[in-house]
């Protein structure tokens, strides 16, 4: 016999960004709890609103499955004493399992007999097991937490109610200072407290009190309502996924509506309008059929359609205040001069341990010039890089960016163009922030990409130099994101800049304002980002082997990892890697000062390998280079089959080791083949 279980936790208003993750976490924790406690079920589903988290288990067994476990004990020779009686070791073993020596049997394992006992445990009633549901609730973790009243226990928000129903039967449980019942809260303004009749009536009972318990249903309602407005008004609405997910977790009973604002505000840059509506007011942007921004917005009310005109007017009033600010800053900022703003950056702190923004920009300018040469930019592009690096942070001191910090770089581009700067310079000012997330948009121009690289490199090296190195999940200065951006930009543009040599060069610049330190840690940190970019689809041993190669060129590292992963599926992979691994292992014994002496070769197999090594010049794609290396496998095997490398003759031994070391030197630019796993 099965029943349905409902668990609902009523809370104070939750931050929108934690609602969905908390629902998923509750579902997973409950599923794990049921599995660990041998309670089978048909399905499990989650519910959430800003004021509740809930989970429903369908078809829950009314009793645990019985448990039968075998336990292996000491060997027979230890379990029996000289008189053939059970020893203290055997007696202690069975006592620890709650059994007696009468339960012992002997089983043979690999030619020797051991004590075994079988323990049978009857399944408990589900009700008794579910008494631990509060422990499941207590196990939830949150990005922020608080405590209230006299509770010493921290939680995301104060708890107001707890419901635990098994079909229609409430279970008597306590969580913190709350005793469970069947009372849930309806909508804050439209509903009342309501009694949940049974687990399967949960959604209907809440709906009667203007609460849509299913996040998926609220999302579908919002989308349908927006689409209806689109059709009626003949407009297009940007349904931003992130904004949609936030809005649906701000409301329990959604009603979408369209508001408007004075068309005069359309003279402000579109980015300012969109930021004001989307980021600050949680409004959806409205466009005409041609995609042009309209003086309208879509918002979602937490309630029904009653008195909607009053709600619309209130939302319009709040937005106009924001747009007034935007219009004011747009007008006033155009009175400022770029050079004056740049000069003031000397008084703006980049970080108290590192220096000012002006010093950061000075270093970035030097790095950008160096990178522009390395990346092969044209003279015109180099000139644009130099100018952009000289001014690229000026917009941080504008009124607009002070009010809307999301627009840094974006407003820099616009103000730079208005001031007569070249388009390439203005674009680079915007693009230097890219990518702004792990999968974010990349710079499109080489000038912007070089400036972005330079800015991120100085940021990385600067923070490492003063010991502000990320540890664990702690990364307050977003250095992982910056480094991931460095790796992605290099890969996207295919710039073959050796990172180890680049970092060496930057350290040699020895800036007066900051001396770079922690070089090894910086390279390891970059390696970790490359490893992450390779992804779990590339086997771990291949990632490690490639990252341990002697060539640290990001696009090539990624290409070689993919080439090796593809090659690992071929029959030729295992023998080739095993041959190369043997070469690598023996080459470690080579004496550095010894040069190869052809006169010391004793057989044709040595000469053949020497000729192959001498003529080996890796070229072409990563796949082609790997094929060149793997083609040496027969020559290497013949060499080992007919040549004793570690011969007693020291001169010959050192000569052969020098030959293998030369081969390693040439092929380790692809990977450290001795790190590859062929088992």
Curated annotation (Swiss-Prot):
Cellular component (GO) terms are: cytosol
The GO terms this record gives for MF are: ATP binding; glycine-tRNA ligase activity
Substrates-to-products reaction catalysed = tRNA(Gly) + glycine + ATP = glycyl-tRNA(Gly) + AMP + diphosphate
The UniProt record lists the keyword Phosphoprotein: no
Tell me a GO biological process for this protein.
glycyl-tRNA aminoacylation
Q: Where in the cell is it found?
A: Cytoplasm
Query: Which keywords annotate this record?
Result: Aminoacyl-tRNA synthetase, ATP-binding, Cytoplasm, Ligase, Nucleotide-binding, Protein biosynthesis
Give EC number(s), comma-separated: 6.1.1.14
Broadest EC class assigned to this enzyme: ligase
Give the Pfam families listed for this entry: tRNA_synt_2f
Q: Note the subunit structure.
A: Tetramer of two alpha and two beta subunits.
The entry sums up its family as follows: Belongs to the class-II aminoacyl-tRNA synthetase family.
Q: What is this protein called?
A: Glycine--tRNA ligase beta subunit
């Amino acid at each position: 016999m099965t029943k349905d279980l409902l668990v609902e936790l009523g809370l104070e208003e939750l931050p929108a960004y934690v609602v969905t993750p908390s629902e998923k976490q509750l579902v997973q924790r409950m599923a794990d709890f049921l599995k660990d406690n041998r309670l089978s079920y048909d399905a499990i589903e989650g519910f959430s609103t800003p004021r509740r988290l809930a989970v429903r288990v369908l078809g829950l067994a009314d009793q645990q499955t019985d448990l039968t476990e075998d336990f292996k004990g000491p060997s027979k020779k230890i379990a029996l004493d000289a008189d053939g009686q059970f020893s203290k070791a055997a007696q202690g073993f069975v006592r620890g399992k709650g059994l007696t020596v009468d339960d012992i049997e002997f089983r043979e394992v690999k030619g020797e007999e051991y004590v075994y006992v079988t323990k049978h445990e009857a399944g408990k009633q589900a009700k008794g097991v579910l008494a631990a549901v509060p422990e499941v609730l207590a196990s939830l973790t949150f990005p922020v937490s608080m405590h209230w009243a006299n509770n010493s226990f921290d939680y995301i928000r104060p708890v107001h109610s707890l419901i635990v129903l098994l079909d229609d039967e409430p279970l008597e449980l306590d969580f913190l200072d709350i005793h469970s019942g069947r009372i849930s809260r309806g909508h804050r303004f439209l509903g009342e407290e309501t009694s949940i009749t049974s687990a399967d009536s949960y959604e209907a009972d809440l709906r009667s009190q203007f609460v849509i318990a299913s996040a998926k249903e609220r999302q579908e309602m919002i989308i349908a309502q927006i689409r209806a407005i689109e059709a009626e008004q003949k407009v297009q609405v940007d349904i931003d996924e992130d904004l949609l997910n936030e809005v649906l977790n701000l409301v329990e009973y959604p009603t979408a509506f369209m508001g408007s604002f004075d068309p005069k505000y359309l003279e402000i840059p579109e980015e300012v309008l969109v930021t004001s509506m989307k980021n600050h007011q949680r409004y959806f942007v409205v466009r005409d059929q041609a995609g042009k921004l309209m003086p309208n917005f879509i918002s979602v009310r937490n309630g029904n359609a009653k008195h909607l005109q009053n709600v619309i007017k209130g939302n319009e009033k709040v937005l106009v205040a924001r747009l007034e600010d935007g219009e004011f800053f747009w007008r006033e900022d155009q009175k400022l001069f770029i050079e004056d703003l740049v000069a003031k950056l000397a008084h703006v702190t980049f970080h108290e341990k590192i220096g000012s923004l002006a010093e950061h920009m000075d270093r970035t300018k030097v790095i950008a010039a160096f990178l522009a040469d390395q990346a092969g930019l044209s003279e015109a592009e180099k000139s644009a890089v130099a100018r952009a690096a000289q001014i690229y942070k000026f917009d941080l001191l504008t009124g607009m960016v002070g009010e809307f910090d999301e627009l840094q770089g974006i407003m820099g581009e616009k103000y730079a163009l208005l001031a007569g700067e070249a388009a390439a310079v203005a674009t680079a000012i915007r693009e230097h922030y890219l990518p702004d997330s792990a999968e974010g948009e990349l710079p499109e121009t080489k000038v912007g990409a070089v400036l972005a690289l330079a800015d991120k490199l100085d940021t990385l090296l600067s923070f490492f130099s003063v010991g502000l190195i990320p540890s664990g999940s702690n990364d307050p200065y977003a250095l992982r994101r910056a480094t991931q951006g460095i790796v992605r930009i290099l890969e996207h543009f295919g710039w073959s800049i050796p990172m180890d040599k680049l970092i060496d060069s930057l350290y040699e610049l020895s800036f007066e304002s900051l001396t770079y330190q922690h070089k090894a840690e910086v390279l390891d940190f970059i390696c970790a980002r490359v490893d992450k970019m390779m992804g779990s689809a590339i086997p771990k041993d291949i990632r490690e082997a490639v990252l341990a190669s002697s060539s640290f060129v990001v696009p090539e590292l990624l290409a070689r990892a993919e080439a090796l992963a593809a090659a690992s599926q071929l029959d030729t992979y295992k023998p080739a890697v095993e041959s190369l691994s043997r070469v690598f292992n023996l080459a470690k014994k080579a004496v550095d000062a010894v040069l190869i002496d052809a006169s010391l070769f004793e057989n044709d197999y040595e000469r053949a390998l020497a000729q192959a090594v001498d003529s080996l010049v890796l070229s072409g794609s990563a796949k082609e280079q790997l094929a060149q290396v793997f083609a040496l496998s027969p020559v290497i095997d013949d060499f080992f089959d007919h040549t004793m490398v570690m011969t007693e003759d020291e001169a010959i031994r050192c000569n052969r080791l020098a030959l293998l070391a030369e081969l390693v030197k040439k092929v380790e630019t692809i990977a450290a083949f001795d790190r590859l796993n062929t088992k």
